[in-house]
Amino acid sequence: MNQPPNRDRRSQKYLGSKGLILLIALLSAFVPLSTDLYLPALPGMGDYFGVSANLTNLTLILFFLFFSLGLLFWGPLSDKYGRRPVLLAGLALYIAASAGCALSWEIWHLIAFRVLQAVGGSAASAVATAMVKDVYDGRRRESVLALVQSMVVISPAVAPVLGAFMLPYTSWRGLFVALALIGTVSMAGGLLLEETIPSRYTGTMKQSVRRLGTVLRNPGFTSLLIVFSLVSTASLAFVSASPYIYQEGFGLSEQWYSLYFALNAAALIAGPFLYLWLSRHFSRRMIVGSGFAVMIASGALVCLFGSLGPLLFALALFPASLMGSAVRPPGAFLMLDQQKEDTGSASALINCSSLVFGSAGMILIYLGGESLVLGLGAINVAVGVVCLAGWTVIGRRGLTKI
C-alpha cells in the first residue's frame, strides 16, 4: 500500500470544505449521540422492562464492546474498498437497527438491536478519523482534529438535555427514532461525499485485516495508543454512572440531571479550544503532561468533596473533564502521524482502543463499592497517574516526536 503525502487539496464538489468537516464531526459523534441521548431514560427503562440496573446497563456496555469490534472490521475494509461504500453500508445497518430498538418489546430484543446498531455506527467513526488523515496535513490536520473534537463533545452536552426534554412528550422509544433520523441525515451526507482515500490497499481482505498487527508493531503508535486510550476509562465511567449519581444518589429529576450533565460536558466542549490556545504558547509535551496532572488533582477533589452535593460534584469533576478533552486533539494527531500508511487500520485501532478502555471504566465504576462518587474520583486519580507516568516514559525514551 503506497499512499502519497497528504495535502489539503481534496475538494468536495457537493459538500464543500465546510460541509466535509461538518460531516466528519457528525460521524465522529455517533458514540456519544447513541449513548447520551437516552441516558436520562435509563433508570425508567429498567422499570419499564422490570429488570435490574445491571441488565439495563448492558445496552450501554455491549454497545461499546461491539462498536469497538466493528471498528476493527470497517477500518481495514475502508482501506481496501474506500471510505464512501463502507460508510454507506454501516449507516444503512445503523438506521435499521435504531428502528429495531424503538420497536423492542423485551430487554433482550433491545440489547440485540443495540449490538447491531453498534456494528453499523462503528463504520461512521472508523471512516471519520481516516478521512481527516486522507485530506489534511500538519498543523491544518491538528486544527481540524481540534475543531472536530470540539464539535463531537458538544453532543454529550446537547444529547442528554434534548433527551430529557423529549421524555415528557415521548417515551424512550422516541429517542431511538431520533437516532434513526440522525443516521438518515448522515446517510444523505454520505451520498454526497466524494471518495477521499488517496490510494486503496491492493492485497486480499485477509491481508488487509492483518495490517492491524503491522500498525500495532509500531512502538511509537502503540505506546501513545495505550496512554491516550486510558483517558476514556475515566470519561466513560462518568457517562455510565452519571444518571445514578445525579438521579438516585442526589435525587434530581431527569431535567435537572441533564443540566448538571451539561455542565461537565461544557468542559469537554472547551477542552479542544483550550488546547489550540495553549499550543500557541507552550509545547505539546508540557500541555499533555499538565493535563494528566490536573486529572489527578480533580479526581482527588471528587473523592474529598463530591459526595456533599450535585454542584460540588460537578465542579470538582470539571477540571478532569476539561483537560481530558484538551489532550484528545494532540493525542489523535500524534497517533495518526506515526503511520504513513494503513490510515484506516490506525483509525480503527485508535477508536477501538478508546472504547475498550472506556468499557472497562463502565464496569470498574460498579465494582468499587457503594459510593459511585468515590469510585469515579479514584478512577480519575489512577488514570491520571498512569497516563502521566506513561507520557514521561515516552518523552524520555524518544519513542516518538512529541
Ranges and model annotations:
Residues 109, 138, 146-191:
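Helix-loop-helix hairpin linking two adjacent transmembrane segments in secondary transporters
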Residues 69-108:
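Conserved MFS/SLC helix-loop-helix module at the cytosolic interface between two early adjacent transmembrane helices
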Residues 286-330:
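C-terminal transmembrane helical hairpin of 12-TM major facilitator-type secondary transporters
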Residues 50, 82, 103-109, 120, ...:
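Helix-breaking motifs and short loop linkers at transmembrane-helix boundaries and internal kinks
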Residues 113-154:
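Cytoplasmic helix-loop-helix junction between adjacent transmembrane helices
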